Swiss-Prot record:
SUPFAM superfamilies: Eukaryotic type KH-domain (KH-domain type I) (SSF54791), HD-domain/PDEase-like (SSF109604). The gene is rny. The chain crosses the membrane at residues 4-24. This is Ribonuclease Y. Residues 342-435 form the HD domain. It is a single-pass membrane protein. It comes from Helicobacter pylori (strain ATCC 700392 / 26695). The lineage of its organism: Bacteria, Pseudomonadati, Campylobacterota, Epsilonproteobacteria, Campylobacterales. Pfam families: HD, KH_1, RNase_Y_N.
Length: 529
């Protein structure tokens, strides 16, 4: 059984081997045939590509030869053109050279001719000079003889006659010199006046600034009338604590709709106002809370002062400046003089001074610096209680400011003479800013007294009929009696009134005095039918 199975397996194995050999032989024949076909196809393609490459190379060689011939022809044409142009230029230059040589020869001949003529003229002048010397000697000799002859018939010596002539000439020259001096002085004054007016007009035209009129009170609206009781507190403790810490008075409106804070110190009033607004908004109003909020607001405002000062310094392009000066500049925002805000006034003075100094050929930046610092002492007067001029000088010297700044602080109040163009510009700008109508405000009573005093001064003089103070007290118009005052007396009366005003006035500025003399005659015309 087992031998039969083995025999069958061998037969199967032999059959498989024969089949595999047959398949191998068949596949080999197939792949060989395919390889031969592929080889023939590749060989044909290679021959085709070789033929195409040869054709392309031959075509390129033909094209390159054609291009080379074309370039060669262009080169020869260009070379011919350049050679022709060169020949023309060379011929032109040779022609110019020949012309130049001819011109030089002509010039040389002309100069030689001129030289000969000048030599002849020189010889003639020398001869004339000799003749003039001889004639001059003859004239002197004749003058001497004539003078000797005159002296023989006169009672004066030669030296005495010379002295008399010199004295007469000296008197005539002195009179002429005096007249010239008076004329030049008048012209210089008129020209200086016109120039100063032009500079001031241009400066004010190029600058248009606002000004702030400060009141002595600040009003704060209340949400409702119940807040009055909260502000006052039990037994008035809250309001007393507020007054004690702030130093500001509080008043209530009749309808209980607002509070009024009053104080001459704007800075103190600003801190108190912000404190009260925070307390009213928060609703917790107690003595301890009042003091806490007040000190916090004061610290924040100090930081704002430095920021305000830095903004002003940057706006005016002043360069580096000490922090203390910046804080004082910011603090001037809460300082006023006759109702005019000190910071706004100082900025206005700085800008005007810069414009004026620029027109006069001075340092614009230095003039602006002196202008912003000229009233810096006003930021310290309410705390230290001293003159703002000396305080300003001390703080500026401490920070080593320019001497021009120190001079401007002194000079704008007349404590020193003006030593520079920049200082003069600051003084002029200060007068412009403070002196224009409406810039500063006084009480109605003081204003009325000033007007009345001006009129009373004019009415004291004999012959004055009426007097009117006009233009906010900057002009006094006086009407005199024509039957008592003659025309030649009008200028004298005007000068006397002006001098009286200068002696009695207690304020700074100018008052123009205008005296009018008028004659009127009235008659009646009768009309008949």
């Amino acid at each position: 059984m087992s031998s039969g199975l083995i025999y069958i397996s061998l037969e199967v194995l032999v059959a498989c081997l024969i089949t595999a050999l047959v398949m191998y032989y068949v596949m080999k024949k197939i792949y060989y045939a395919r390889g031969q076909a592929t080889l023939k196809s590749a060989s044909a393609k290679a021959k085709l590509m070789e033929f195409q490459a040869k054709s392309f190379v031959e075509a390129e060689e033909i094209r390159m030869k054609s291009q080379e011939c074309k370039l060669q022809q262009q080169y020869e044409n260009k070379n011919l053109q350049l050679q022709t142009h060169f020949d023309k230029k060379e011929a032109h230059l040779k022609h110019l050279e020949a012309q130049h040589k001819e011109f030089v020869r002509d010039e040389k001949r002309y100069l030689e001719k001129e030289k000969k003529e000048l030599e002849k003229e020189r010889q003639i002048l020398e001869q004339e000079k000799e003749n003039f010397k001889k004639q001059r000697a003859v004239c002197k000799e004749s003058q001497a003889k004539a003078l000797d002859a005159m002296l023989n018939y006169m009672a004066y010596t030669k030296d005495e006659i010379k002295s008399m002539i010199l004295e007469q000439l000296e008197e005539e020259l002195e009179a002429q010199k005096s007249a010239l001096i008076r004329r030049y002085e008048k012209e210089a004054k008129e020209e200086g006046k016109k120039k100063s007016y032009a500079i001031l007009a241009e400066a004010t035209a190029r600058f248009a600034g606002n000004y702030a009129a400060e009141n002595l009170t600040t009003r704060i609206a209340l949400p409702c009338s119940d807040y009055i009781g909260r502000v006052i507190g039990k037994d008035g403790k809250n309001i007393e604590a507020f007054k004690k810490v702030s130093g500001v008075d509080i008043e209530f409106s009749e309808d209980s709709s607002e509070l009024c804070l009053s104080s001459f110190n704007l800075y103190r009033r600003e801190v108190a106002s912000e404190t009260l607004k925070i307390l009213i908004e928060d609703g917790r109003i107690q003595p301890n809370r009042i003091e806490e909020v007040y000190h916090r607001v004061a610290r924040n405002l100090e930081k704002e002062l430095l920021s305000e000062g830095e903004s002003v310094v940057l706006e005016l392009e002043l360069g580096a400046m000490e922090d203390e000066l910046k804080i004082l500049i910011g603090k001037m925002r809460y300082r006023s003089s006759f109702g005019q805000n000190a910071l706004q006034h100082s900025k206005e003075v700085a800008l005007l001074a810069g414009l004026i100094a620029e027109q006069l050929g001075g340092d614009k930046k230095l003039a602006r610096r002196a202008g912003i610092l000229h009233d810096i002492g006003k930021a310290l007067t309410q705390e230290l209680g001293r003159d703002h001029v000396n305080l300003g000088v001390e703080v500026c010297k401490r920070h080593k400011e320019d001497p021009v700044v120190i001079n401007a602080i002194y000079a704008h109040h007349g404590h020193e003479e003006i030593l520079s163009v920049e200082c003069a510009s600051v003084c002029a700008a200060d007068a412009l800013s403070a002196g224009r109508p409406g810039a500063r405000r006084k009480s109605d009573e003081e204003y009325a007294k000033r007007m009345q005093a001006l009129e009373e001064i004019a009415l004291e003089f004999d012959g004055v009929e009426k007097a009117y103070a006009m233009e906010s007290g900057r002009e006094l118009r006086v009407i005199v009696k024509s039957n008592q005052v003659r025309d030649n007396q009008v200028p004298i009366i005007a000068r006397k009134i002006a001098k009286k005003i200068e002696e009695s006035a207690q304020y700074v500025g100018e008052v123009g005095v205008q005296v009018v003399r008028e004659s009127r005659f009235k008659t009646t015309a009768t009309l008949k039918q």
